[in-house]
C-alpha cells in the first residue's frame, strides 16, 4: 500500500488515505 500523509489536514483531503487508514486527531495517520 501507499504511505499516508502524516499531517492531519493532508490526510483529510486524501481519499486513498482515508480509505486505508485512520487519521488520528493528533495528526498522525495510523
Curated annotation (Swiss-Prot):
Membrane-spanning residues: none
Annotated PROSITE patterns: SQUASH_INHIBITOR
SMART domains: PTI
S-S bonds: 4-21, 11-23, 17-29
The entry's keywords: Disulfide bond, Knottin, Protease inhibitor, Secreted, Serine protease inhibitor
One GO molecular-function entry: serine-type endopeptidase inhibitor activity
Subcellular location: Secreted
Gene Ontology cellular component list: extracellular region
InterPro entries the record matches: Prot_inh_squash, Proteinase_amylase_inhib_sf
Site (described: Reactive bond): 6-7
Free-text note regarding domains: The presence of a 'disulfide through disulfide knot' structurally defines this protein as a knottin.
Functional description taken from the UniProt entry: Inhibits trypsin.
Family: Belongs to the protease inhibitor I7 (squash-type serine protease inhibitor) family.
Designated name of the protein: Trypsin inhibitor 1
Organism: Citrullus lanatus (Watermelon)
Lineage of source species: Eukaryota, Viridiplantae, Streptophyta, Embryophyta, Tracheophyta
Amino acid at each position: 500500500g501507499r504511505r499516508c500523509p502524516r499531517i492531519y489536514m493532508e490526510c483529510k483531503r486524501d481519499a486513498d488515505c482515508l480509505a486505508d487508514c485512520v487519521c488520528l486527531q493528533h495528526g498522525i495517520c495510523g
